[in-house]
Amino acid sequence: MRRNRVDVITLGCSKNLVDSEVLMRQFLSNGYTVHHDPASVCGEIVVVNTCGFIGDAQEESVNTILEMVEAKKAGRIGSLYVMGCLSERFREDLKKEIPEVDAYYGKFDWKQLISHLGKSYYAEAENRRKLTTPRHYAYLKISEGCDRSCSYCAIPIITGRHRSRPMEDLVEEVRMLVKHGTREFQLIAQDLTFYGLDLYGANRLAELTARLSDIKGVEWLRLHYAYPAQFPLDLLPVMRERPNVCKYLDMALQHISDPMLRRMRRRITKAETYELIERIRTEVPGIHLRTTLMTGHPGETERDFEELLQFVRDIRFERLGAFTYSHESGTYCDKNYQDDIPESVKQERLGELMAVQERISAAHNEAKIGSRLRVVIDRAEDGFYVGRTEYDSPEVDPEVLIPFVSGQELKPGRFYMAEVTGAEPFDLYARIVD
């Protein structure tokens, strides 16, 4: 165990990662050294920032807590604290089941944790978080919470009502990060497309995106977690006309059959979904759409699932993720539906869906062979420089693999023009041409 060292372990989504980065800056401001590598935890203080979204994430969080409890018993770490979504949702249960943890805190309890340790909380440090990502890119969380009421989702229970961050705060944070070398920003929120309604009485996502794109030094802005119902169409001209706003949109659609959309309480129809996608692709030529779909929601029939498969074949999403339904306590589903789809059926449908998407992804990538694309280099690994295009977000999307060439050294964080020379379903191969 190392004195004056804090280890922060982050589980779950990029929004959780931002929370950890804010907390890490508070520890640094109080004179601690801070580490974010779960493989080398040995601190005087360990904080596990948990995820509580669905069953698999909850299990991973509990297992991580138990691993840290064993490390504490063995003397490899000192105090152990747990916070985040799982702790926000199940704090009393966790206290009973795992009492070895020194204290449990909710998702937004940074001040309480710092106060418990007898340290000072520096409000001015909230916009100076300690990045855990490579310096050239960062996640920018523009709001907290969610006002939607999707049947399956526990996020509003955990995070509360939607709360936009003031636009000036976001602009200032991006300016500060640019000064320190950040060039690429992923805009994230539980619901990106609700931004501004609470603060300004109107949707202001388009204005925010435009203002951020005006900041000198911002190379790429990428939009994540849009909601299809009441989509702000004034965003589309901003995406089309501004070169540093990536032609990329992450919009979770979940399903397409009208019976399922109603049961999911998505507030959009099949016809409206097709119309929205056509409008987006018409107004922003070349845009790459990422979506997330679900299999096995209560009541999903074979006919519903076949509609979903046909939807994927029709739209041919450039990027797609999928997961199986998880029955979560406190949700509308929990109160009104039975979890009536066997797990084996959920998994079978998931596999079939992803097999269809793999063929589509392969075709999209093969069509890029011979094209020239701007690439940012993230790292060097196993004989390749590994980078991404504007159509690829970190961690979740394909990568561009550029073989080492004698006399050619590519720098992480730098942008290059590359010619695509080969393709796999989820990765590209390329060579530098500038």
Curated annotation (Swiss-Prot):
Residues 366-434 form the TRAM domain. It is an enzyme of class 2 (transferase). One of its GO terms (cellular component) is cytosol. Keywords: 4Fe-4S, Cytoplasm, Iron, Iron-sulfur, Metal-binding, S-adenosyl-L-methionine, Transferase. Residues 4-122 form the MTTase N-terminal domain. It catalyses: L-aspartate(89)-[ribosomal protein uS12]-hydrogen + (sulfur carrier)-SH + AH2 + 2 S-adenosyl-L-methionine = 3-methylsulfanyl-L-aspartate(89)-[ribosomal protein uS12]-hydrogen + (sulfur carrier)-H + 5'-deoxyadenosine + L-methionine + A + S-adenosyl-L-homocysteine + 2 H(+). Binds 2 [4Fe-4S] clusters. One cluster is coordinated with 3 cysteines and an exchangeable S-adenosyl-L-methionine. Belongs to the methylthiotransferase family. RimO subfamily. It comes from Porphyromonas gingivalis (strain ATCC 33277 / DSM 20709 / CIP 103683 / JCM 12257 / NCTC 11834 / 2561). Catalyzes the methylthiolation of an aspartic acid residue of ribosomal protein uS12. This is Ribosomal protein uS12 methylthiotransferase RimO. It is found in: Cytoplasm. InterPro entries: Elp3/MiaA/NifB-like_rSAM (IPR006638), Methylthiotransferase (IPR005839), Methylthiotransferase_CS (IPR020612), Methylthiotransferase_N (IPR013848), Methylthiotransferase_N_sf (IPR038135), NA-bd_OB-fold (IPR012340), Ribosomal_uS12_MeSTrfase_RimO (IPR005840), rSAM (IPR007197). Disulfide bonds: none annotated. The keyword NAD does not apply. Its cofactor is [4Fe-4S] cluster. Residues 132-363 form the Radical SAM core domain. GO terms for molecular function: 4 iron, 4 sulfur cluster binding; aspartic acid methylthiotransferase activity; metal ion binding; protein methylthiotransferase activity. SUPFAM superfamilies: Radical SAM enzymes. Its EC number is 2.8.4.4. Pfam families: Radical_SAM, TRAM_2, UPF0004. [4Fe-4S] cluster 1 binds at C13, C51, C85.
